[in-house]
């Protein structure tokens, strides 16, 4: 009987430990890098480095473009809101932000990778310009209505990139 109780306790502890991912830095310490890391994680986790960099480069390009908000967090969180201020589901610039799912990264290795890359891009200005000014992208398996109104930049990994004409 003691064995079963101990096994149950160990399984519980292991599951709790798996559910908690490591943060290299907190949202309070580096808010812009943290927002960028979340966007890299949810938009391109598991993709090659060039694809992850390109997704982040689009966010930075939007920050520099007067048609978009002025900070990384504002760009990442941009979307339609209810009069109450709550985000309208599936009406955000980046789909993961208002899809109704938990936004806590679950894969520790991919989350650490996203945090490292975001920090390098935001605070060390690495990898800038890979998308040649692209402000839009989509996964290769979708055909958004807006794609024909923009100039095609090219494909990097699992995404197709565009900029204003």
Where are these regions (language model features)?
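N-terminal signal peptide c-region/cleavage motif recognized by signal peptidases
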Residues: 13-16
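Bacterial extracytoplasmic/cell-wall-associated proteins, especially those involved in peptidoglycan
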Residues: 20-165
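Sec-dependent signal peptide recognition
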Residues: 1-8
